[in-house]
């Protein structure tokens, strides 16, 4: 067992270049790369200099001031942190190597995360894995001095770089140096937690095994914002516009462009995950389709299981904010405006449900009073997310078409809390026309079909556990759904839905666009899924104009990409001994059934709120 007194600081990483074992492996790698041994030694040193962090204690205080200067240009200085959990982690770090994996919503994430540790005297600060694209002039030097490790995006075909990185990771793990990185790899453009990137996690797990590092804890960290500084960029990317390249000029424009007040930043630490916690995990669950990448019969890899547990733990501590709830309510109104009273009546019920379930809340969360809802609406108007029309009988509020994708981002940050209820509503709506009474087995079959359709969108818990929540939430709203005393159609009218149409409509409609266009191709293969997803934006626009889909939030290259991922998983892009046209038609029928069910939910909602 390696103890802390045996360890070296991160600045001593260059000693690995003189290690006998490394030199022997470098000789073999030089042959594969076509370099002489001298060239290989020189290139290996260059690779290590490029990637290695050079942290210095004297740089931490000025770096923390710099980080605060950046995020406080728009956000409140005081971070909302669950400090009691952070204190427990401080105690845990004495006997365990802590690896922090955080959600990635904004460029502000790493600044807020490191300040949350620094200001609470958490030492040593973890070294941060970052993309080489952030190693631009000026910023890269500072970041390296406070512990940034810069990695190339692709290095699979570079045997020397891979060798250096493997030995560098071994050095970090062997010397018990805490590490941190974004489990998503890149910023979420939709608001939902993105599928985890397994690259760094796999390297770290393999290093832990090689170094026999037993006491390792993966710490999930949720970083959330009242408002996202980059929200307009995310909307543009979903609409097919190119991503802006990072540079010093870009960084300066980004920082000094932050002028409006964006509210609070929330840093919430979750329950640590150990390797032992994930043994046998995912046997009955889905990891946003990650298991589909594993070899047949092998089951999910250790990295997949760890990533899934970390992501679900992040979701469990993500705070629910008042504006997130109101965007869900307003987006569920089918493009119509709601009065303040109507928003309040719907939001109050959701707030009561949230408190009953004991879900994590942002500090100051309150929607139980009309005055509180009014204040949130005022704030959302200030952010141009919501508009008011006050020249009629009563003032009404709505999300304009060009802000639907932005509003959907905030709604999506909390949809996982209401997913079981949403799927229960859709499953009931699918069977609403049946003459026979819906039984529990039928409901479960429909829910599992919905899980399979949306497997690349959400992190689903094991099937039995998830369906138990579906039953609980469905029975909470529709107590006689399986009793037969009242038809499902009547029950859905009497108790209008809350979540199915509000959460799943944009995804289902985006998949409908994918399915329609694929079906029209017949047997024609799709060889470039990325290009095809971008090309779907125009058919999506056409279908919106023809009212085959309902709103702008269904026209999203990100949603089209996950829809195509599902189609690819089902073998519907390239012929592989099956009839593509027939398979695509079945896919279209499945998605159309879901869209039809959601339309039924929407019509019942509209009847309840817009029929005088």
Q: Locations of the language-model features?
A:
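Membrane-interfacial terminal anchoring regions of lipid-handling membrane enzymes
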Residues: 1-612
């Amino acid at each position: 067992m390696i103890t802390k007194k045996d360890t070296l600081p991160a600045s001593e990483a260059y000693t690995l270049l003189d290690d006998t074992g490394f030199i022997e492996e470098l000789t073999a790698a030089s042959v594969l790369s076509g370099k002489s041994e001298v060239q290989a030694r020189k290139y290996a040193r260059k690779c290590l200099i490029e990637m290695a962090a050079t942290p210095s204690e004297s740089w931490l205080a000025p770096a923390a001031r710099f980080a605060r200067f950046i995020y406080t240009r728009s956000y409140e200085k005081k971070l909302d942190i669950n400090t009691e959990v952070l204190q427990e982690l401080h105690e845990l770090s004495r006997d365990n190597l802590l690896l922090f994996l955080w959600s990635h919503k904004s460029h502000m994430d790493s600044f807020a995360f490191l300040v949350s540790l620094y200001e609470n005297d958490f030492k040593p600060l973890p070294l941060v894995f970052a993309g080489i694209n952030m190693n631009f002039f000026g910023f890269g030097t500072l970041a390296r001095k406070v512990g940034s490790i810069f990695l190339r995006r692709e290095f699979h075909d570079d045997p020397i770089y891979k060798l250096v990185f493997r030995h560098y990771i071994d050095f970090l793990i062997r010397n018990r140096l805490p590490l941190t990185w974004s489990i998503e790899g890149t910023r979420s453009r939709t608001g939902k937690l993105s599928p985890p990137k397994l690259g760094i996690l796999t390297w770290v797990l393999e290093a832990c095994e090689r170094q026999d590092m037993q006491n390792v804890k993966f710490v999930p960290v949720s970083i959330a914002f009242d408002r996202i500084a980059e929200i307009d960029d995310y909307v543009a990317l979903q609409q097919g516009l190119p991503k802006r390249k990072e540079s010093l000029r870009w960084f300066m424009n980004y920082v000094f462009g932050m002028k409006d007040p964006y509210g609070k930043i929330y840093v919430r630490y979750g329950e640590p995950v150990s390797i032992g916690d994930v043994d046998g995990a995912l046997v009955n669950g889905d990891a946003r389709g990650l298991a589909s990448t594993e070899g047949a019969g092998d089951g999910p890899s250790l990295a997949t299981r760890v990533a899934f547990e970390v992501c679900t733990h992040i979701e469990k501590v993500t705070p629910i904010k008042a504006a997130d709830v109101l965007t869900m309510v307003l987006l569920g109104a089918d493009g119509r405006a709601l009065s303040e009273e109507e928003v309040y009546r719907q939001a109050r019920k959701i707030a009561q449900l949230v408190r009953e379930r004991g879900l994590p809340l942002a500090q100051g969360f309150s929607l139980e009073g009309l005055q509180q809802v009014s204040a949130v609406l005022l704030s959302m108007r200030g952010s141009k997310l919501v508009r008011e029309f006050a020249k009629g009988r009563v003032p009404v509020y709505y999300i304009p078409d060009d802000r639907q994708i932005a509003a959907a981002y905030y709604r999506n940050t909390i949809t996982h809390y209401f997913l079981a209820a949403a799927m229960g509503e859709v499953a009931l709506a699918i069977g609403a026309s049946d003459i026979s009474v819906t039984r529990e087995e039928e409901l479960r079959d429909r829910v599992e079909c919905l899980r399979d359709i949306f497997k690349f969108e959400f992190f689903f818990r094991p099937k039995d556990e998830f369906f138990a929540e579906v039953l609980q939430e469905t029975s909470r709203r529709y107590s006689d759904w399986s009793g037969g005393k009242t038809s499902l159609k009547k029950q859905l009218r009497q108790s209008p839905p809350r979540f199915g149409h509000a959460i799943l409509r944009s995804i289902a409609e985006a998949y409908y666009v994918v399915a329609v266009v694929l079906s029209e191709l017949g047997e024609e293969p799709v060889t470039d899924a990325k290009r095809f997803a971008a090309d779907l934006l125009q058919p999506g626009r056409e279908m919106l104009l023809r009212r085959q889909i309902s709103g702008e939030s269904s026209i999203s290259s990100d949603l089209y990409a996950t829809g195509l991922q599902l189609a690819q998983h089902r073998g519907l892009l390239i012929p592989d001994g099956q009839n593509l046209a027939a398979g695509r038609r079945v896919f279209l029928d499945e998605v159309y059934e879901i869209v039809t069910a959601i339309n039924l939910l929407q019509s019942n909602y509209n009847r309840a709120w817009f029929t005088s």
